[in-house]
Amino acid sequence: MSESVTNWIKGLSGQDEVVSMQGSATLALELAAHSFVAGKVLLVSTGYYSDRLEKLLPNDCELTICEYEELDSIKGNFDWVLCAYTETSVAFKVDLESVKNKANECKAKLFVDATGSIGLEDNHQLADVMAFSSCKGLFGLTGAGFVAYKSDLNPKDLDTFYFNLNTHKNKMTTGPYHAIASLYGVIEKHNIFKQRVVNSKNTILEKYQDIVRESNQPLLCTYLEGEVAPNDDSIVLYSPRSELSGSVICHFGE
């Protein structure tokens, strides 16, 4: 079961190695950052979740932060470029090919927060390192974090036990078995679940075409320039972590 899920995630992520652990995407992102990221770092800012990556980095990184719209103006070399593929706090998707091209131009590796994009968006293979969780676009139970990376990279051997990628890679502690089991049940149905998200997304874009962003639309969620109010007590609205004049809706459970 675990091998089947791991191989499936390798295919979705376009990565050679996938390490699972109990915990959230936040844990996976911080562990990935401490296992691989060092030196000069360029952080591409798009909202709350991209900006939060600064707090997850090793303290000795030399950090430069740029707005996504200013990416073309960045010059010089870096060791790493960091971004959130789908910034759920504002329902914005970066053009990952453009970010990868800038990373190549800067002679840098690419680190991607794929929490809101894995299982839904394409081109994850462009990342050198990425991290995400078992829910959202993988449609599994919450509770598993994943770090995925290319085989030509070697994680640092940190002087900690639990907070150490090699500990989880070598299965030296209890794994996220419940979440892995849920993902095993998703594999054959993932395309069905994804299509429901696509259908919901297209419906919203068509219905509210005058108040949605023209580009950079993620499948996971949509920003509407207006206030959304529930018409049923059973509806749970998404509360974004960014201060917005409009509303963000997510396309699950349709």
Regions from the PLM with identified roles:
Residues L27, H34-D79:
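PLP-dependent aminotransferase-like
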Residues C135-E206:
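Active-site C-terminal subdomain of aminotransferase-like
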Residues E69-G119:
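Active-site phosphate-binding strand-loop segment of PLP-dependent enzymes
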Residues H124-C135:
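Conserved active-site segment immediately N-terminal to the catalytic lysine
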Residues M1-L31, S35, L56, V197-Y208:
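Conserved N-terminal alpha-helix of the aminotransferase class I/II PLP-enzyme fold
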Residues R213-E254:
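Conserved C-terminal alpha-helix-loop-beta "cap" of PLP-dependent enzymes
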